[in-house]
């Protein structure tokens, strides 16, 4: 079973990816892990990626695509299947993935798209506050400080401010939507309602994956 999981930041993609791996035994392939492994193992593409990262440059698509191809060509993938997480990030990378899978004789069976209203994500992602003295982290809605607290005792990181979060989500939507549209043409996208309990989201995902087996 070869799968791709997609969803906006805060949609619970990481949580659900871990559950899928545990339940179905597929290999979890996240971009960060892939890069770290390729660099640690000093593969051709890993060394190339390191040369860009060490200079503080962005790693070009062709190197990222090469690292993905190196990983997908390993034996455990053919045995167990994979769950791609965090790649492809752009439509160009999606086309490169299509070519890679064709070269390796692999097929993408399904795209799990966790669909969450972006406005609710702004609320979810911009609620984090940090106590100025202790550095303790809280969430205005999901994990507020005890009792009546004084907002002046807390601060927000720039990354967590609503306008920054909204910009980040807008970028993700602009990049992600063409990828979803691309795979929708093949009829392999399965939209999962993400505005429900974690366990309920996974029940829906499990049904989809079992239907593909």
UniProtKB/Swiss-Prot annotation:
Residue span of region LID: 127-160
Compartments where found: Cytoplasm
Sequence positions that bind AMP: 31, 36, 57-59, 86-89, 93, 157, 168
List of residues binding ATP: 10-15, 128, 137-138, 196
Keyword Cytoplasm on entry: yes
Domain notes: Consists of three domains, a large central CORE domain and two small peripheral domains, NMPbind and LID, which undergo movements during catalysis. The LID domain closes over the site of phosphoryl transfer upon ATP binding. Assembling and dissambling the active center during each catalytic cycle provides an effective means to prevent ATP hydrolysis.
Official protein name in the record: Adenylate kinase
Organism lineage string: Bacteria, Bacillati, Bacillota, Bacilli, Lactobacillales
């Amino acid at each position: 079973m070869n799968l791709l999981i997609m969803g906006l930041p805060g949609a619970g993609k990481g949580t659900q990816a871990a559950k899928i791996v545990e339940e179905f035994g597929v290999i979890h392939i996240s971009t960060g892990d892939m890069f770290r492994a390729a660099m640690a193992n000093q593969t051709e593409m890993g060394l190339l990626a390191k040369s860009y990262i060490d200079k503080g440059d962005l790693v070009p698509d062709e190197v990222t695509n090469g690292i993905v191809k190196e990983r997908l060509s390993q034996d455990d993938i053919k045995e167990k299947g994979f769950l791609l997480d965090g790649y492809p990030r752009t439509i160009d990378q999606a086309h490169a993935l299509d070519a890679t899978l064709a070269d390796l004789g692999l097929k993408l069976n399904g795209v799990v798209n966790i669909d969450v209203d972006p406005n609710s994500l702004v609320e979810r992602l911009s609620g984090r506050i940090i106590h100025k003295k202790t550095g303790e982290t809280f969430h205005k809605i999901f994990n507020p400080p005890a009792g009546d607290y004084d907002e002046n005792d807390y601060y927000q990181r720039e990354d967590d401010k609503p306008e920054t979060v909204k910009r980040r989500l807008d970028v993700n939507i602009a990049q992600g939507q063409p990828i979803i549209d691309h795979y929708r043409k093949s009829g392999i996208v399965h939209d999962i309602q993400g505005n429900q309990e974690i366990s309920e989201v996974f029940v829906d995902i499990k049904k989809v994956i079992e239907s593909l087996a």
